[in-house]
Amino acid sequence: MELQTMKITKDCVVEVSSEEEGFEGAWFRAVLEENPGNSSRRKLRVRYSTLLDMDGSSPLIEHIEQRFIRPVPPEENQQKDVVLEEGLLVDADHKDGWWTGVVVKKMEDDNYLVYFDLPPDIIQFERKQLRTHLIWTGGTWIQPEIEESNKSMFSPGTMVEVFSAKEAVWSPAMVVKETDVDDKKKFIVKDCNRYLSCNGDEARPTNIVNSRRVRPIPPPSSVDKYALLESVETFSGLGWHKGQVRKILSENRYTVRLEATQQESTIRHSDLRPFMVWEDGVWYNDLKQKPIKETPPTILKRKPMRSCSAAKSMTPTSATKHLRSFLNSKEISETPTKAKFVSATRELGKNKADAVMNDKTHLLITPQETSIAPVITVTPLKQQDAETEGKKSPKKTPEPVKHQNGLENSSTQHEMPEEENSNEKSRKRKREQNQNSNLNETDETCNVSKAGVNGTSDTIRVDDVDDQPLSSWINIPTVLSSDQSSNVVDNSAADVEETQAKGALTIEPFTKNLPFWKTYEMEKGYKTVPQNPHFSPLLEFKEDIREWSAVGMMVSFYGLLEEVKKLQLDVSSSKLGSLSTCFAELEKHGFDIATPQSRINKVLSLQVGRAKKVEERKCLEKRIEAEEIEMQKFEHEMVEVERKMLELKRRAEVAKEKKEAADKMIVEMKSSAETIDQEIANVELEFITSVLAPW
């Protein structure tokens, strides 16, 4: 498309471009101060209309090659009735000049997104700030053809979300350009606000991100109400954070726990959306998510041991799993006093349960107190359906609890050997032997009489039992020899008698033989934060390493405690998470971690608060930067006004000089006029004298 031919002459307004870095593709208004010559190589003197010299007091004057000078494009290409299509080359009024770009999208309120190639950027402009781009060649204006727009999913101007691994947040952004870096597909993106507007803020930075960190904007949400424990995304700060609904409140509000920080906040429905996954170009609902599970009651596990020589023997581990599965399935028959299981890791250090068995009663479980609590009768449970690792196991009837400890417990009476009536000294000596061998697992088979195995008709009733591992409920050896099995009942009964006399005893899976136990209590750390862990999970370890493992845990606890004391506010979240995980592991062994854990949570809370303040500071900095830009514009206006004032002052001085010269001339002419008047009067007087003279 060709337009009319135009010429440039001295004192006409022209536009000047430059090859200087940072100014490519820009045209600045100027006044041509000399006529073009016959030689095109001759540089012409121009005075810029919008650019000032270094001191800012006067317009910038340069000598420019003629190939960088052109006339001002016709005003028709800037009229509002000119349609600006996507892909059209335009000039944008920006930074005191006209910069060439491409229209990539028409926005609301007659605004347009324009893409610039050097440097890659997209800025929003009003219609009045744009004009169609024309090329000046051979003394004629030519309008280039419309470029074919990129219709890909991530074309320039497309709104997307960019993932920040550090903050675990999806932030709104705009695709500026798709590029290849080291043969890898990447995107240049520009941060935008939540409402998908850059507001013409060219100060917003552009970033190069990996394609895997970019996804489209999720489809609009049509959810009227979110369910409890549903995975959602909540908008906070500069993006969307993954979380889980923990409470449903009134007035369309929810308590949401953020996955990254584990902090809970009250969020309105309008600031939530369903959690979705972008994979292989398709949006998926989070169907594979696993709800956050509350920590189930823990029951101490034991390593498998050799089965007893009785029908359908069962290892302690499998029996423990069956019992735990049954309790977790909530299928225990409720009685006036429910069996309440609490975490063994928290209660084992505080309570001890003794089991007393004889040939006429079932397995007896009593909470450990100074005085014996009412006896609670326990009957075997039938194994119900329990899910293990997402699959249901077939129904199975567990063996009586006696098999887990190598003991007999039958509904039929069974006579014990004559050693049952041995003297008190013998019982105490054997009890000491049993306690020393307690919880030690061997590969030997236990010789349990078949009369005690017929437990199919036995029933177990649990009324009120403190949550204790099975090994701590029955304070007897894990594996008994044939000689020891005959004295089990007497020894257990003697334990109860001794407990009544001496109070509760602490059950530990090892004997404290190392000198460490005598010295560490004198340490400053122990005196400040004393600990009395039970170390019950060490029952899964071999006996030779239990005590050393316990020593390591004690040293680790106080070492971690020192790290918590020295925490700084700028510590990484991964470090805090690691400390929290370590303390959680130590808690399983009976350590009291409430104080260090609360301090870690406090540091996390302070970090979140500081992050919010930092974000507020960044917003203020952006506002300050915008105000500074505005202030610079005012300064330029003031400089221009001052320049004009100086010009007017100079002109006033010139006018004053001319006025003074004119006044002087007038005075001189008036003086001359008076002289002439006097001469005329003299002539008239001489005439009269001559006429009146006598003849």
From Swiss-Prot:
Pfam families: Agenet, DUF724. Keywords: Coiled coil, Growth regulation, Transport. Residues 509-694 form the DUF724 domain. Residues 614-684 form a coiled coil. GO terms for cellular component: plant-type vacuole. SMART domains: Agenet. Residues 384-402 have a biased composition (Basic and acidic residues). May be involved in the polar growth of plant cells via transportation of RNAs. Homodimer. This is DUF724 domain-containing protein 3. It comes from Arabidopsis thaliana.
